[in-house]
Amino acid sequence: MGVFRFISISLAAVSAANAAQILSMPHAQTVPHSYIVMMKDDTSDDDFNHHQSWLQSTHTHNITRRATIQNAGMRHKYNFRKMKGYSGIFDEETIKDIAKDPKVMFVEPDTIISVNGKVEQSNVPSWGLARISNSQPGANSYVYDSSAGEGITVYSVDTGVDINHEDFEGRAIWGSNQVNDGDDRDGSGHGTHTSGTMVGKEFGIAKKAKLVAVKVLGNDGSGPTSGIVAGINWCVEHARQNGGNDKAVMNMSLGGSSSSALNRAAAQAVEQGMFLSVAAGNENQDARSSSPASEPSVCTVGSSAEDDSRSSFSNWGPALDLFAPGSNIISARPGGGSQSMSGTSMAAPHVAGLAAYLMALEGISGGAVCDRLKELGSSSITDVGPGTPTNVLISNGGAKGGNPKPAPGPSPNPSQPSEPQQPAPSQPGEPGESFPGEPFPGEPFPGEPFPGESSPGESAPAPAPMPPSPQHPHTPYPGGDNFDFDGYWKKYFGGEHWRKMFGSFWN
């Protein structure tokens, strides 16, 4: 009996020593009784399946005994090849039992993540497209290569997308709804706006890329971390089965308190070949305090204003990789038409769209894309913030062989905002709010400017009508009877043209 007691005590001591850490999130808004569990990297499929079977039995026993939590159990299961895990609603005793499994790396409370920008301002210019293709601010044309992101798929991990908006030309599809609200639409407008910047025919950078809507935030602009991790997992698997992760871009214009689970999920997506653009956040603070912006392997984006200064609301610090236009950006709105928003949420899709553009043009992918964006960008941003290692504003590098296209401008009657073709979906509460009646930390109420930004006018300008399609370099005999064949051949098929078009490969 004494020997048996000694062995029992020894096993208990070993179990306690190997117990996984249950992380605390004292400054975050948590989801009651909801947790994310991450397994150790060497966990096999068999071990994971065995753990789930054990969990079901243990959880059922604990709930039956106490019956204190409604709708408890596993909600999401994650499998990123090298990283496995799950989330769900569990009582305290079950969480303690889970942490004792030596295959568990850590347990993390599920926290609320929100969009990183939702402000409507009136009578402002649309300048972001023109800025990324011109060396100086104030230009009014967007110059781009006619490849325009063709063959690349962009995943909008956001509030959903109005996939029927005319700006997407049928290139947008609905992918997944991790909110599980039965509402496959963008009831906020945030996801449609960011998607328009990425791939829209009028507002977008990669005008020929495909778009997949992945809803991870509700119509109020917020959602649990567990659902966002599930959304990332879905994107990785969908891309792998549909063209490859090296042909995929993910945009996450969202953020919240630092989360090991969310950062690890984002890192797994990058490791498997995807490019991730992430908003730095709008609190005018060090971006290392939030996720997924603090994950080193993603491309973390700060916001710039029209005068090439850091937007007053933009986060800063060592986590930042790049800056992109984010103040007063006009893009698509649900139901048709356009609206203006500000935030690092608007900056990140500029980077995602340009990433898709460069991936199609140069054949690069994954982590190499962020490095290429740094090479092509200009050292233009002023007042970058404490500890920020970069002042680089993104640029498409003069759009090798590109064609000019005017950026969206004011409508003939600038006092009238661009209206949707049909009524926008009803919105429960003010979209983009963390709590009813309150704006996100560091953001103004809708209709008010950020501190230090220009005051709003009376209405937002509508985009200008689409100009005639720019002439493709291979369009035969432009100019009709006056066509200069020798000059045309020299311009488009001479060595200088091809050196410019493919210099990145040859030099």
From Swiss-Prot:
SUPFAM superfamilies: Protease propeptides/inhibitors, Subtilisin-like
CDD domains attached to this UniProt entry: Peptidases_S8_PCSK9_ProteinaseK_like
Pfam families, sorted: Inhibitor_I9 (PF05922), Peptidase_S8 (PF00082)
Main location group: secreted
First and last residue of the signal peptide: 1-19
Domain Inhibitor I9: 34-113
Any GO CC annotation of this UniProt entry: extracellular region
Location of the protein in the cell: Secreted
One BP annotation, GO: proteolysis
Ranges where the Peptidase S8 domain occurs: 126-400
Known role: Secreted subtilisin-like serine protease with keratinolytic activity that contributes to pathogenicity.
Family to which the UniProt record says this protein belongs: Belongs to the peptidase S8 family.
This protein's name: Subtilisin-like protease 1
GN (gene name): SUB1
